[in-house]
Amino acid sequence: MQTRAIFASAEGRMLMAGLVLAGLLVVGFGIGWTLFPDSILQYAAMTGLNLLIGPGAGMSFGYASGMSHLQVVPLNMLVETLHVLVFYPLFVLSWRHLLDLPALKSFVARMHEAAASRGGMVRKFGIAGLIVFVFVPFWMTGPVVGSIIGFLIGLRPWMNLAIVLLSTYFAISLWALLLNELSAWAATFDRMAPWALLLAIVLI
């Protein structure tokens, strides 16, 4: 592992920012658990669903729990930002052999295969293709794979990061409106219906 080269690279600085942000989030949850133990469980569950399944599940849980846009949207944006700031640099640093950790080899192979198999449109249309790739969630693409494709087609690190995150934030904002409306509509039939909607999203 070449520590100096890692921290001299843009991806190394992104990784540090991601780790600091993740640490602050954990501290925030710890403080919240002390001050507001009941409320913080909802935020922790929403975060966990986002990490394990995706933002659709996390946001659906938030709206089914009665949370507002101001509670749901920023946290899911933060979690997606952490995804990119941690996993994208780990891929790049491992790809360049600046990080040589056996545990990362399978991750790098999987991410490269996913990016290679799904990145045809992005390579053809460049930045516009990357924006669409990240924006459309039903392709099971996501910002992490999108950022890796951006790297593989030669985008500069900070431009790649900006495109991926802005597209992600825009997508989350629009899907938040839709999921909130769906949750409210489902609740008109039965108070448990929003949870059935969440289950459907998880199973899909």
Q: PLM ranges: what are they?
A:
Residues 22-26, 51, 77-81, 164-173:
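Alpha-helical transmembrane spans of integral membrane proteins, capturing the lipid-embedded, hydrophobic core
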Residues 120-122, 145-154:
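Membrane-helix boundary/interface segments in integral membrane proteins
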